[in-house]
Amino acid sequence: MENLLLALKLVVALGILNVWIVRRVQPTPFRGQSAQTLREEFTAYGLPDWVFKAVGVVKVALAVALLISIWKPELKLAQPSALALGGIMVVALGMHLKVRDPAIKSLPALVVLAMCLGIVLL
């Protein structure tokens, strides 16, 4: 179980960092509506620019906290970080529903939500 928990933390944290730092301005088939960048995706959902910035800061901070939890488990960061990220994924799923995206566009949020639940429950 320790190996599974480690894998979940790494995949979630590195995935979030990849999306928000490395691929923020690159198109993917999972962006809402016809958005080509993360900023455009938030605009497509009808959200102001400050929400894009705030969500980015929070998600990167939570991903870093998950990574810290690997080396400093005594800080007890894993479960609260995963719970918060899971909540953000629920909101992301709601945004995809709001703009009536095809179900496939919700897949990354659903998978990250499942992995976050795994972290919380393990």
PLM-predicted stretches and their roles:
Residues 1-122:
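Membrane-interface extramembranous regions
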